[in-house]
Design a protein with these regions (language model features):
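Conserved short alpha-helical segments that host acidic/polar catalytic motifs at enzyme active sites
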Residues: 1-269, 273-276, 285-317
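Glycine-rich phosphate-binding loops that contact phosphosugars or nucleotide phosphates
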Residues: 317-385
Length: 385
């Protein structure tokens, strides 16, 4: 679960647009935040992970509030807010990521399932890695395919169409889910987006083209958008119309425009009279988000969750499962525990209210795993557990 955003504009609004969009998308990941943008022909990247004493988004905002706006010539950029799956919550593991030759910069929402074999293959071709993430592998894979196209055509003078071919070859190698927004250091007037499973929304307005993983990321600045289909590639660049530079886009497929609902997403219950009713009405959408709009559902109808693969041996060694929850989360956990009993081969599956759980409730023999289900983000009794 991550939020991502991108923009190409004919006005100097990139950084403000990215920061405002990430503010609206912060519910998609509190662990880290970052942006990358072209300042003239140079890519500038700034990213932070949250700590126990500092919020990554506030730190990023403060850095750019302290800078003189005249110092930046920002028309194109990408941004990301992270929920850590592959790799620890650190600055270096935060997005955007770049290839080891600094050719490609990307942000990514999703999980690359075959990252281990891809990483080993790229290392054998001389690529290096700074992070523990699956996303850095995609950046290096883009560079690899771009370089191979240069070798095959025996030229260093490659066009932005070669970038698109490199993207096509890259996604053929990937297994999993992804929403990708891509910058190339050779082309400061171009942005690319592609997806498989993870959603990407794209909007073309009078002065800019914007990309977001969900509607709230547009933060009220667009009138309409379309939802990119799986494995289509959106190429975004400038077109000259009557000697005026206009941001434009191209896709292989034809899309129907969707009007944006006019509401203040994060700061008000509008159009509902109060927050409770808004949350009730948004439950179907919340269920879809929990599934990452299908991005966590694999083609064989199994579910892919981030972080499980690294602990799979420990999970398989468990004999007992205990759900701990409070309030409505406790009711949900009661249902989940009954499903676990039916589908899973654990010796025992139990569910406790967090306020009533005691240390003596833990089975005395064999390994026990705990599933803590919070309510509205924070539950004191679960902290106690």
């Amino acid at each position: 679960m991550c939020g991502l955003i991108g923009i190409l504009s004919n006005k100097n609004i990139c950084i403000d647009f990215l920061l405002n969009g990430l503010t609206q998308l912060q519910n998609r990941g509190y662990d880290a935040v970052g942006i990358a943008y072209f300042n003239d022909s140079e890519i500038v990247c700034t990213k932070y992970a949250s700590t126990s004493t500092s919020n990554s988004l506030e730190k990023l905002k403060k850095e750019y509030s302290d800078k003189n706006e005249d110092d930046n010539n920002d028309f194109l950029g990408i941004g990301h807010t992270r929920w850590a799956t592959h790799g620890a919550k650190t600055d270096i593991n935060s997005h955007p990521h770049w290839s080891s030759d600094s050719l490609f910069y990307i942000v990514h929402n999703g999980i690359i399932e075959n990252f281990r074999e891809l990483r080993e293959n790229l290392i054998s071709h001389g690529y290096t890695f700074q992070t523990e993430t699956d996303t850095e592998i995609v950046a290096n894979l883009l560079s690899y395919h771009y370089t191979q196209l240069a070798i095959d055509t025996d030229t260093d003078d490659l066009s932005k169409e070669t970038d698109k071919d490199a993207i096509k070859n890259t996604i053929k190698d990937l297994t999993g889910t992804w929403g990708l927004v891509i910058m190339c250091s050779l082309f400061p007037n171009n942005l690319w987006a592609t997806r498989n499973g993870s959603p990407l929304l794209i909007s073309q307005q009078e002065n800019f083209v914007a990309i977001s993983s969900e509607q709230s990321g547009f933060h009220g600045k667009v009138k309409n958008y379309f939802s990119l289909e799986n494995n289509d590639i959106c190429s975004i660049t400038y077109s000259n119309i009557n000697s005026v530079k206009i941001a434009s886009l191209h896709t292989d497929k034809i899309y129907r425009s969707i009007d944006v609902k006019n509401q203040d997403f994060a700061n008000s219950p509008h159009p509902y009279p109060h927050w409770t009713l808004r949350e009730i009405e948004e439950q179907p959408d919340s269920v879809l988000r929990a599934m990452n709009l299908g991005g966590r559902l694999r083609s064989d109808n199994s579910v892919k969750l981030g972080g499980i693969l690294e602990q799979i041996d420990n999970v398989k060694a468990l004999h007992h499962i205990i759900f701990l929850a409070c309030g409505t989360s406790f009711n949900a956990s009661l249902f989940a525990s009954s499903v676990f009993k039916h589908l899973c081969d654990f010796t025992t599956v139990q569910c406790f209210d967090g306020a009533e759980f005691e240390f003596t409730d833990i089975p005395k023999r064999s390994n026990t795993g705990f599933i803590l289900v919070s309510q509205s983000g924070e539950t004191k009794d679960l902290h106690r557990c």
